[in-house]
Amino acid sequence: MIIFTATLIIILAYFLGSISGSILICKTLHFKDPRQHGSKNPGTTNILRIINYKIAIFVLLFDSLKGAVPIWLGTYFHIDPIYLYIIAISACIGHIYPIYFQFYGGKGVATAFGALTAISINFFIIIIITWILTVYLFRYASLGSIVTFIVITFYVWYIQYHHFEYIILLSLIILSQHKNNIKRLWNHQEKHIWNR
């Protein structure tokens, strides 16, 4: 029964993750389509650049909840922790490859943030401190995300966090979505967080 419940939540997490906060909010409020403007990435940073910080905050909260809600649901049904990590991965894959938007989505950072925060407050603290500090020092949102998930990877490996391999897999998925950002950072072509 637990395995059946976990499987249903894993599937639900993908479909929930596929709902794009930026596209939905922009359509509802009649703002420009983030897929057609700026970096053309339907994520929080692009919304910050092409619209404003208030809408970006709503998108961040929406996309974070997509990761958190399935985890909370799994916790409510007392499923094994290993399934919680699979649920987190499923939600992020839904965000990155959304079935509702021709499998073209964001990078999964906010959704991963929500999922990991729902799993442990320690992840919340690490992510917030690392991201804010990195962006404050270097002014690149993408670098903040890259450094954050590298730190998460080493953290769970170093302390041998239970089922840490799933969290490392999640981090690698997020990092793989930043390959173009890494190239631009290397070539000094990446835009600062506030640059349009």
Curated annotation (Swiss-Prot):
A single Pfam family, by name?
G3P_acyltransf
What highest taxon heads this organism's lineage? Answer: Bacteria
Q: Which InterPro entries match?
A: G3P_acylTferase_PlsY (IPR003811)
Name any Gene Ontology BP term. Answer: phospholipid biosynthetic process
Q: What is its EC number?
A: 2.3.1.275
Q: Which UniProt keywords apply?
A: Cell inner membrane, Cell membrane, Lipid biosynthesis, Lipid metabolism, Membrane, Phospholipid biosynthesis, Phospholipid metabolism, Transferase, Transmembrane, Transmembrane helix
- Tell me where it resides: Cell inner membrane
Q: Where are the transmembrane segments?
A: 1-21, 55-75, 81-101, 118-138, 140-160
Q: EC top class, in one word? A: transferase
Its pathway?
Lipid metabolism; phospholipid metabolism
Q: Which residues form a coiled coil?
A: none
Classify the main location: membrane
Any single GO CC term annotated in Swiss-Prot or TrEMBL for this entry: plasma membrane
> Which GO molecular-function terms appear in the entry?
acyl-phosphate glycerol-3-phosphate acyltransferase activity
- Entry membrane topology: Multi-pass membrane protein
Catalytic activity reads: an acyl phosphate + sn-glycerol 3-phosphate = a 1-acyl-sn-glycero-3-phosphate + phosphate
Biological role stated in the UniProt entry: Catalyzes the transfer of an acyl group from acyl-phosphate (acyl-PO(4)) to glycerol-3-phosphate (G3P) to form lysophosphatidic acid (LPA). This enzyme utilizes acyl-phosphate as fatty acyl donor, but not acyl-CoA or acyl-ACP.
| NCBIfam families per the UniProt record, alphabetical | glycerol-3-phosphate 1-O-acyltransferase PlsY (TIGR00023)
Q: Which HAMAP family match?
A: PlsY (MF_01043)
Instruction: Fill in the subunit field for this protein.
Output: Probably interacts with PlsX.
As for family, the record states: Belongs to the PlsY family.
The entry's protein name is Glycerol-3-phosphate acyltransferase
